[in-house]
Regions:
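A binding-site-centric feature that preferentially detects glycan-recognition modules on secreted/surface proteins
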Residues: 1-226, 232-306
Length: 306
């Protein structure tokens, strides 16, 4: 057996790096059979100290986030805040999920404990997180459902901000035009929603600075209970417009798990300030003019399934 065959596929640089990592003395002891080697897989941390996804190894475009665009985490003390979000959901969608504030709080605390125990992903809770209930899915067509959810967004947003307006630039254009992106895991959420209400944690901006193609690319290396956001972002906006659309300085939100007419196009929410009327507003539209670029105020979101 030739020496050339034994190191086939290795460059000199890779071999030198291996010896450097081992240490020359240790490498020689291994070579002489003087020591045994045990291997332990290194668990990579997937989120930084701010709760942002570490974009290592992605091919799609990513840029640094502009932290002037941010969400404020409100203190979720007791059941009152949970109850307010649930009430907005029930009132605007005219549904009853059957999940109480006490039940949601208990489920969210359980999910947070799971995240804290996993060193790879524990940092995500350093960012903003929101308790969400996805209602039971009634319609077969996702475009029909999205139209209904966006109507609820308008009601909730203008109820919280009576002097503002919500502009849905795709109103009446979504039926039979919306699908789930492959490998986004959003189909797991949809499957659960067809069975009944689904509680979970919505993380609005762990992907700030990612293009929506990068949003989609990164999901495959996260633990299975993480889902790339789509419909859950809309429901989170229904429940918490005061956080997600506070003013111009809140990040714009990609619905990267959903495609509009083709996989090259998706959706986003954008909080804007209209200088003409001197008022903030919330817009919903498609991403046709954004791809494939990364913007420092845009973010995809993640949903952690309960």
């Amino acid at each position: 057996m030739s020496e050339r065959w034994m190191i086939q596929g290795w460059t000199n640089g890779e071999l030198n790096a291996l010896v450097k990592n081992l240490g020359e003395e240790t490498a020689r002891k291994i070579q002489r059979g003087e020591v045994k080697v045990s291997l332990e897989e290194v668990m990579k941390v997937l989120f930084d100290k701010h709760g942002r996804r570490i974009p290592e190894g992605l091919r799609a475009n990513v840029c640094d986030p502009n932290r002037d665009f941010r969400f404020d985490q409100l203190e979720l003390i007791g059941k009152a805040y949970y109850a307010n979000g649930i009430k907005r959901l029930h009132d605007t969608l005219e549904v009853d999920t059957g999940i109480s504030a006490k039940q949601l709080k208990r489920e969210i605390e359980h999910l947070l404990a799971i995240l804290r125990e996993n060193s790879q992903v524990a940092n995500i809770i350093n960012g903003v997180w929101l308790p969400v209930i996805m209602p039971k899915l009634e319609a077969d067509d996702l475009g029909t459902t999205l139209e209904q959810y966006l109507e609820a967004v308008g009601k909730s947003y203008t109820d919280v901000f009576p002097d503002r307006k919500f502009n849905n630039y795709l109103k009446g254009k979504l039926v039979d035009q919306v699908s789930i992106v492959d490998n986004s895991r959003h189909d797991q959420l949809i499957k659960r929603m067809r069975q009944g209400p689904v509680p979970g944690i919505h993380f609005p901006n762990p992907l700030q600075g990612f293009s929506f193609q990068a949003d989609r690319e990164q999901i495959v290396t996260l633990p299975e209970r993480f889902v790339l956001s789509g419909l859950d972002t809309v429901i989170a906006m229904v429940m918490y417009p005061d956080i997600l659309a506070r003013n111009y300085w809140t990040p714009d939100l990609d619905l990267a798990a959903l495609s509009y007419q083709s996989t090259a196009d998706s959706f986003y929410f954008e909080a804007l300030y209209d200088v003409v009327v001197d008022e903030d507003e919330l817009n919903f539209g498609d991403t046709a003019n954004l791809a494939p670029h990364a913007y420092n105020e845009f973010s995809g979101s993640l949903f952690f399934l309960g």
